[in-house]
Amino acid sequence: VDNQKIQGVITSLGIKIYAKSVVLTNGTFLNVLIHIGEKHSGGGRAGASASVGLTAVLEGIGSVSGRMKTGTPPRVDGRSLDYSKMSEQPGDLNPSKFSFTDLTKPLSNQISCHITHTNLDVHDILRSGFGRSPMFNGAIKSTGPRYCPSIEDKINRFADKDRHQIFVEPEGWNTVEYYINGFSTSLPEDIQFKALRAVKGFEKVKFFRPGYAIEYDYFPPTQLTHSLETKLVSGLYFAGQINGTTGYEEAASQGLMAGINASLKVREEESFILKRNEAYIGVLIDDLITKGTEEPYRMFTSRAEYRTLLRQDNADIRLTPKGHALGIASEKRLRRMEEKLSKAEAFVGFFRTQSVKPEEANPVLESKDSAPIRQSDKMFKLFSRPNIGIKDVRKFVAVEDYINENNLDREVIEQAEIQVKYSGYIAKEKNNADK
């Protein structure tokens, strides 16, 4: 750093890498401390090295740091579990995708998760280790995530509960490792192992890795601008857990935005900022910059004032044009989105103009306990009724013919249905956002 401008990076080996922009995405590695019972060790995720010294450098240029905590559950061998004693949780019949491209195909081979529960015996075993728990003996003083407390925290705070859910989640298709969600813990390994073996279906469980708590440095995000650039140093950007967030999507979205803005900075172009009514990324960053956080921040739909506008189905419509303008979304992707939007709007227009006669409409309406009509009425009006869905209006000959003639896919049909069903709410929210 020279004259409050970033000059580059010096590695631990003393190698200098010059750059006009630098993005720090340190995760939980800054002065990290891992706790497993009474054992404490420096290191990031299990087996990785800590980042030591960087916090002091940043504090030396005026940045203020804090300390946070998170935790992770044990990883176990899925082959050692008895799933017949658990409740199966199959995946969605028609799973949605994160991507709107046609490159990824629908999942055809999903692996089920399972649910089991702790019990009073498990709780007694866990309590027997509280004296050696860093959560209770004062070794951990940092603030952890409010919405995913450790199992020892749950049985201590909710002592009236006889059991807590455990979600048994496969790590992937090509591994036998399972993630025991709901059992995050920093208790000693022997207590973790003994307690899990008292859980139904886990009587013969084999461990890969124990759970642990992890403390790390972060920098309160009020020290950043909305571009995720630090206010103190031009060209220096922070993204992810260094800003006090927790969660994969939260970190990934910040990394994307910081990377975009670091690139724009080098090209001497205006920063790219998403507003609260444009994307959840906009809500996330605005919350961090304006309100800050003293506990690991997680994104919820309830944090957004305009969540009727920020829907999963229209993410491509909202953001692809912006991505294309930045050069990170292809022309093909933009054209695909425009075609989808055009078809959806035309389908909505069809419902607005097309009428249906009582003799065709009433059997459908009556089957859904919806009031019959006495004269021809617009399909849009009938479709807007709360208990009438796309499956119902597809029973009208004209609707099914339109879908087939225009080769409408599921995305287009869903988009049109949402625009019809929520038209009043969407219009009202757009009006509020524009004020």
Predicted regions span which residues?
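Residues forming the flavin
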Residues: 1-325, 329-330, 335-356, 362, ...
